Regions:
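Beta-rich catalytic cores
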Residues: 92, 124, 162, 188, ...
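Acidic Gly/Asp/Thr-rich repetitive segments characteristic of extracellular carbohydrate-active
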Residues: 1-25, 30-39, 406
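Right-handed parallel beta-helix/beta-spiral solenoid domain characteristic of secreted/periplasmic
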Residues: 48-119, 151
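Surface beta-loop-beta hairpin patches that serve as ligand-binding interfaces in beta-rich domains
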Residues: 367-370, 374-422
Length: 422
């Protein structure tokens, strides 16, 4: 399948497509024949056009049987690999640009080898560019999807750099059970970049691994906007100055963020948030295995601020050492001697878990985390008056608190720190 033009994506077709599902058989599809990829927008339509794309169907069942679906066996891949060499490089295309009045959901799909060349300005991402204008909204929803091997070759330091998997110029993204892996940028977001105060990024049960981002957010760069993360693992990414970095607001709960000193230089989390952004951490494991570098760096003026709401295992130093920028909690456990925190690699499950004494670390409850989310996160410059409440509603919709990232039951009365329940 190839989309040769954008002729079918017009306001005239909005009414036909609104509310429809598109079922896609397993296979590899070159999604566009132009560097900018496929642009989807319906400017002037009265509402967001809602489209759902479901992958993973048996090709032999096409037009016959929707029951024959197995996304693992019948892998559905949208690619920009026009030169068919298996990597994102010159001659390849970006994948999707989402403009005004589109709300598109992909389920059970892989997005691979999207490429954005650094001398062009017709797209900012190898994978998805979310860029609604003043006359509409753009929403991307991904469920059980993979974004891999995308590359934004934007010049280091420029506004076009970064966000190789997803570049959020302006809009909303909701990622549930999504893997972002092996994407690359010269700087500012090897996997994701958020670039506007009106942009919102929700993440649940995601894995961000193997991405390369140069500097300033080698996994995620929050130049602006709002990040809400639950039950997610960020590890084995490479670069410097924060695997998560930026001045946008950050709500990070029940997540495991561990970077290896052999892969990175600089802090794991580099925060420049203003107090009005109300950024906070709760019930996470956050470690920097590079003992010479901080785990959390509060950068910028003295007005910047990040708060712990407790139950975090924090391994490594926090800088500046003496500061009002980072508010600690008596229910956290901090130690620059990382080994004493008893975080171990579980090779059978390929995850980091806490193996400490339960009597030495107070565990929190699901209700306490939910309450912190819904009542304590109302960042400024946000489309919602209470963004935490909106995030909480979405987490309930996707049943985010009943299981850990591997699908194992969570003990709601004694949650283990990080993304996994032992």
């Amino acid at each position: 399948m190839r989309t040769n033009t954008n002729s079918a994506i017009t306001t005239a077709n909005a009414k036909k497509l609104d509310g429809k599902n598109i079922y896609v058989a397993g296979g590899t599809y070159l999604i566009a024949d132009q560097e900018a990829g496929l642009k989807i927008e319906y400017s002037g339509y009265s509402k967001q056009v809602e489209i759902k794309v479901v992958g993973g169907y048996d090709p032999q069942s096409t037009r016959k049987d929707l029951s024959k679906r197995d996304p693992v066996r019948y892998l559905t891949t949208f690619t920009g690999d026009a030169n068919n060499n298996g990597i994102a490089d010159a001659g390849d295309y970006s994948l999707f640009t989402l403009g005004n009045q589109i709300d598109i959901t992909f389920e059970g799909c892989t997005f691979s080898c999207g490429y954005h060349p650094n001398e062009k300005i017709n797209g900012y991402s190898g994978g998805f560019l979310i860029a609604n204008g003043s006359s509409g909204n753009a929403t991307l929803q991904l469920n059980h999807c993979i974004i891999e091997k995308c590359y934004n070759a934007g010049v280091n330091g420029s506004g076009e750099a970064g966000g190789s998997g997803i570049f959020m110029y302006k809009g909303t993204a909701k990622l549930n059970h999504v893997q972002l892996r092996n994407n690359k940028a010269s700087s500012r977001g090897g996997a994701i970049r958020v670039n506007d105060s009106g942009s919102i990024l929700f993440m649940n049960n995601c894995s961000i691994t193997g991405n390369e981002g140069g500097q300033f957010g080698y996994a995620i760069q929050m130049s602006n906007g709002h990040l809400c993360m639950n039950n997610t693992t960020v590890t084995n990414n490479s670069g410097r100055d924060g695997t998560i970095n930026g001045a946008g607001s950050m709500l990070i709960v029940n997540s495991t963020i561990i970077e290896d000193g052999a892969q990175n230089s600089g802090a794991v989390i580099r925060c420049e948030s203003w107090p009005a952004r109300q950024s906070f951490l709760m019930n996470n494991i956050i470690l920097n295995k590079n003992a010479d570098k901080p785990v959390i760096e509060m950068s910028g003026s003295d007005e910047r601020h990040l708060t712990s709401k407790g139950y975090n295992l924090v391994g490594g130093t926090i800088i500046p050492v003496s500061t009002n920028k980072f508010t600690t909690s008596e229910f956290d456990k901090y130690n620059s001697m990382i080994s004493s925190l008893n975080v171990v690699w579980d090779a059978n499950r390929s995850v980091y878990t806490w193996d400490g004494n339960v009597n030495e670390f107070t565990r929190t409850t699901a209700d306490a985390v939910k309450n912190a989310i819904t009542t304590g996160f109302k960042p400024d410059s946000c489309p919602f008056q209470n963004l935490g409440e909106e995030f909480g509603k979405w987490l309930e919709e996707v049943d985010a608190f009943s299981t850990d990232q591997l699908g194992n039951p969570r003990d709601k009365n004694a949650m283990w720190p990080g993304a996994y329940q032992k």
